[in-house]
Every structure is written in C-alpha cells, then in structure tokens.
Amino acid sequence: MNRPGMNAVVIAALVVALAVTPVFAGNFMVSLLNDIGIGTLVALGLVLLTGIGGATSFGQAAFVGIAAYASAWLSTAHGVSPWLGLPFALSLTGLSALAIGMLTLRLGGHFLPLSTIAWGLSIAMLFGNMDALGRHTGLSNIPPLFIGSWSLASPQSIYYLIWTLVGLAYLFSYNLLRSRPGRAIRSLRGGAILLASVGADAYRVRLTLFVTAALLAGLAGWLYAHMNRFVSPSPFDVRASIEYLLMAVAGGLGHLAGALVGSALVLILKNSLQDVLPLLTQRAGQLEAIAFAALFILLLHFARGGLMGFVRKWMQRWAGPPLARAPMARVAPLAHRTLPARGTPILSVSGAVKRFGGLVAVDDVSFDVNAGEIVGLIGPNGAGKSTMFNLLTCTASMTAGQVRFLGQNITGMAQREVARLGLARTFQHVKLRPQMSLLDNVALGAHSRTQVGFLKAGLRLDVHEERQMLQEAQRQLDRIGLGDRAHELAGSLPLGTQRILEIARALAADPVLLVLDEPAAGLRRKEKMALGQLLRKLCDEGVTILIVEHDMDFVMKLVDRLVVMNFGSKLLEGVPVSYTHLRAHETKANLVCRLLLE
C-alpha cells in the first residue's frame, strides 16, 4: 500500500475509534481521553512553534491559564455565557501573546527559552495573587457548557466537542503548513536572511506563529475551565508547561500527529505513575517529576524524532512506490514585472565604503549593471567581494556611498524590501530546506508575489493563489531542467543540482536582477559547464545577472563585463580578455591577472 493510502486508513480507523469509544468506555477512560484532547491542542501549537518554527517555549501553560481564568471569571462573576466568554478569552490570550512575543521573540540562542520561563512564572504568580481570581484557592462553581438545552457537564457529553475542536485544529494546521505562510514557517530554521531574500519578514512570521500557538493553548484553556468547572494556578505553572513540551517532544516535534501521540503517551504514563508510585514510596510526587525528567533526557538522546519519527521510518520501509501525481489544473499565471529595455542601467553603485573599525573592507567602489548583461565581480580571497555583495543586497549597512536600483536609492533598506523590488539572490553556502520538496523550495521564492495570510491559508481559502504559486514553481523547475523531480526532497540532491535549484527559487520571485554569490564554488567541471549554460540561457531570455566569483575560468567564458576588486578597491572594469593577452602587457590588468591566478 502506498503512503497516502496508509495515511487514509490510519485516519479513518482513528476517527471511528474515537467516535465509538464513549459508547463502550467508562467515565475514567472518557475523562482521560478528554484530557488527552485538551493536551493535544496545546502540544499541537508547540509542534508548530517549536518543532517546525524553531522557537522553544517553556511558558505555554500560562496561555492555557489566561483563557481558562478569563472565561471562568466572566461566567462566575458576571454570569456571561461560556460561548460569549470564548471570543473574550481568545482575544485576551492573543493580545497577551502578541505583547510577550514582541518583547521576547527577537532574542536569540538560549535567551528566548529563558525568557519564556520568566514570563511563565510571572503569569502563574499573577493568577495566585489576584483577589478577583480567588488567589491560590482559584475559582469554583464554573458553569458547564450548554448547546441549547443540552448540558455538556458529563465527560461523555463534552467528549465530542473536545475532539471535534481537535480535528478542526488539526485541519487548520495541516492546511497552514501546505500554503504560502506554511512554507515560510518551515523555512524559519533556515535563518532570517533566507526569508528576507524572498521578501518575507522572519520576525513577523515567527510572531504570528507564536500568537497562533497561544490561541490553540487558549482554546484548550477554555475547554479545561468548563469541563472541570474549577481553576487554580497550579495547572498553569512552568511545570505544566514543561509537561506540554514533553508531549510534543515525545510524539515528534516535526510531525503534527506527534501532538496527539505525545499527549496520549505522557498522560497515560502520568496516570500509571500516580497509581503505582504511592504503593512504593511516600514521595510519589518527587519521583514522578524525576521519571518525566529522565524520559525527557532519554528522548533527546535517543529519539529526537519522537515516536512519529519511528512511525515515519516504518511507513517509508513498508509503503509501496509513490503514485504518479496528477498534473495541476492550469490557472492564470502570477503577474509578471515588465523588464527594463536591454542596456538600461538597473543597478548603480557610487562610492561604496564599508569599514569594520579600522579595517576598510570596501573602499570607494563604483560600477553599474545594465539590463540584459552578465557582469562578473571578481577578485582574490580577501578582495572585498563578499562584503560588496552584502552591501548590494542590503544584508550589511554601508559606511558611505550609495546604491540605486531601478533609479531608487536602496541604501539602508531592509533586505526583504529590496527583494520585493526585484533583486533576487543566491547564497555562497546553499540555503535550501532539505525536508521540503523541490517544488516547495522554489515556490518559497514566489512568496512576495501573493499576500495570503495565516487565517486564509488555514481555512483553505487560498486555493487559487496556491495553485498559481505551485504552477510558477513548476514552470521554473521546467526552465532549469528539474521539472520531472519536483516532488523529491531537496536534501537528496547533489551540491551542483542544489545550486541550480537555488537559482530556480530566485527566478520564482520574477526578478529584474539576479545576484549570485559564488555559484560555482565546490562544483566539478561538468557541473560548472551545466551551470554556465543555464546562466547564458537565462541571459538570452532577458534575465540580468551579477556574479560574485573567484573562479576565473568559469567567469571569463561567461560574463559580458568584469569588475575586478583587490584589497577592497576596484582595480579594473571592462570586457573580459584572454589570459594570454593580459600576460602580454605589463599593465595594471596584468598585475590583476597574476593576483587572481595565485
């Protein structure tokens, strides 16, 4: 059986099992499944945020508590219906997450997880010290949910609501990851520079994802309050947050299904320990914490992919060959830019200077790039090529001078804004997402050409725009000769093919200027020949190209014009000539040639 067929069978079996369980199971089992469903909602947000987005949170239980307390307080103190309390609870949770995220998500390294512990502790302490929330005693006699006259006070009656919401949350998350914002989410681990190169704002994507994960936790908190009809600070402290994170890790941080698997594993284990440990010792609570800590450490050492990692390997082993995919339905193409007439200046660098303290990396460099040509920026190691490249793409700030693109001064602009203007780039060290298909990697390049957001994507209201982006990605793959490998993983490609794939991603942005950072680095002779043929073909099709390179053989056969740098300065600019001609004249050009050959 092929993998899609296996997935369909597993999902159908799970839905049937969940549907009939309350008919045969007792109150304890149904209550446990309710807890698993609520835990799944929180863990699902953590899979998106931490596993896929790469932002670790040790404070997710605080968002569960904000929504739980908000709805509980409204319904007990003011008699507001829980259904009216839901939008209030989610709004308060979302605004809290927005404020916290704006303060903390720019932190890097271990500072972000530490900050989540800090605000998680603070919010839990706030719950325990507010008179309106009952301080450490909490709020009791919270009204149950009603659908018309039908009370959802019993475990069996609220069961179907919980699991319906879990199913909808899964569907939303699945749709989200298979969309324009989903590709940006899956690329967050590639770094902010990668997303900026396609016109996306990594901080904004991460912040929106942070709020989305908090809203899933808030939905779980609302259900928790009206299912248990009692709230107190202890279920929302940092220890509970670590438990939710353990659910995501145990199930598999990279898999949506891992949230359900991990929640079931952790809560079943927790209930088992609570039954067994009191029979063995009077310090059952301490041993339970030690047991979960040991499980966490073992998972990080031996099963970082979680249980779903093992399941995926098993499915890959036993699934049959993938089915041939039906061709996509044709839709109207994405809007294209009108390219400047051949020979029109599109990039102008004037007096560029970059200093790092007392070191002058780029010293008063000026040159132009005209439409329809291939320009090579060359020089020996340490000449300042990479620094110049970073100044052109606005990855680094300029000490003095100016860069104009299409007549507009882009000096000091954000890289993502320059990318949206039509300046696309590749990287010296390939930046592809290895676990994404070739098609998705290239579709990421078209990110700035549509405006689909999280909500529209999650509700699957982006079908037309998504087809347009995938159609454009397929067109670019066909253009570079990889169209028949669209659904392979990018990580399975050799280096030379990965570099060509990066060019396809840049082309998907419909650029006016394509800037390549040492595209021939690490390539074998035949791969360089193939790359050169591709670039010349693209130039003939109207693409303007600037190549930053130190491989003279590759550049001299390809470019229309050369700009030569050494020690941060421009030494020579003009039409390339043969090595023999350069060596025949004792001029500055001869000196440059010998420098490059050393």
Label every PLM stretch briefly.
Residues 453-485, 512, 533-536:
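Conserved ABC ATPase "signature" region
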Residues 401-408, 420-421:
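Conserved ABC transporter NBD signature motif
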Residues 1-328:
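Transmembrane alpha-helices and adjacent helix-loop boundaries
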Residues 375-380:
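The feature captures the beta-strand-to-loop junction immediately N-terminal to the Walker
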Residues 514-518:
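Catalytic Walker B motif of ABC-type/P-loop ATPase nucleotide-binding domains
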Residues 580-587:
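Conserved small/polar residues in nucleotide/adenosyl-binding loops
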